[in-house]
Amino acid sequence: MEDTKKTVLAGNGEKDVPRAVYDGVLTIDVDAQVESMEEQEEARWHQLLNAHRTRKILTGQLGGIEKLESGWMVAVTYFNGFRIIIPMNEMMINLQGDGRENADTLNRQVRIANNMLGCDIDFIIKDLDNKSRSVVASRKDAMLKKRQTFYLGEDTEKPMLYEGRIVEARVIAVAPKAVRLEVFGVEVSVR
């Protein structure tokens, strides 16, 4: 029977119990379950744990640049409701040709990262803390993995990206005189 389930009674065998008396929320969909907020959060955290274990590339929108109490400058993004921090030295921001070669590297990176706010960035989770639910990631690792995948052919295969091929690019920053693009792991400025 579809609308009953078997329940084992103490010493009396099994008995059919109507679906209407099941514990929990009675849902419209016969086989649906209602998950608590804690269960949903655990499922999302488990997804991050799996991504960390498999080194899967994830994508999030760059939400801010912050200076931590320790003095570290980090980029902040969110994935599945969890705050992800990326140290500035793991952002792999291309500083060549920005016209400020003599300026402080960190300040240049922060300036460019501020122009990138709101753009989608790829990252790979480097470390997680189960207790505090803190996540540290690397954009650099994701970009290097994408380069390996798209620019270098596997064994005797031809690379997916080659001279003359038309490809899509992700616009990551716009300034009055230049646009920054990310093309499958390679960041370039177009003036």
Task: Please tell me what each predicted stretch does.
Residues 1-191:
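Single-stranded RNA-binding regions, centering on S1/OB-family and related RNA-binding modules
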